Amino acid sequence: MLKDLVGLFILVLLLSAPVFAEERKPFIAGGVTFLDKHEVLSVEMGAEVLPNINWSLGFNAPIDSGEQEHFGTHWAEKQVWGLHTALGYEIRVNDMLAITPRIGLNYNNVEIEYFEEETGEYVDTDSQNNFEPTLGVKVDIASVGLIVEGYKIDEDISLSEEDEVAVRVMAAYNF
């Protein structure tokens, strides 16, 4: 499954390559999204598509084997993967410092499998596709940057009873 997801991400990058190739200031970023007690690897590629306007496209893939939670006589295992995109306006403070507020859209594919507590037998699967808006900021110092974004987790995909916020933290390198 992960191989298919990586293939999909590479296909999307290849389709968007002409946009990145013609524009200035490309960057690549990598980090982690903390999603409901679940860590998801995040990779992103972006560039300046208009003067001071940055656009990026990224991919999220699971790092671990999945989050597990117990519900009475059942336990559940959750797997998450997704895509994200963001658009930002770069504010150049000086030659070495730029701040880019970002808004974006995050897509998550979530699969939750339920198992019997005592026997470990499979009981049911719940699969969902969710889109959530994101807010964030990218801070660049010379050629190194930090991207922090957040979005509210849909309560239908959370194994927690409380409202949760996903946080994506990535280090970026500007070419």
Question: Where do the model's predicted regions map?
Answer:
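Cleavable N-terminal export/targeting peptides
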Residues: 1-25, 175
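Solvent-exposed loop/turn segments connecting transmembrane beta-strands
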Residues: 30-42, 93-95, 154-165
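Transmembrane beta-strands of outer-membrane beta-barrel pores
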Residues: 32-36, 59-65, 91, 105-111, ...
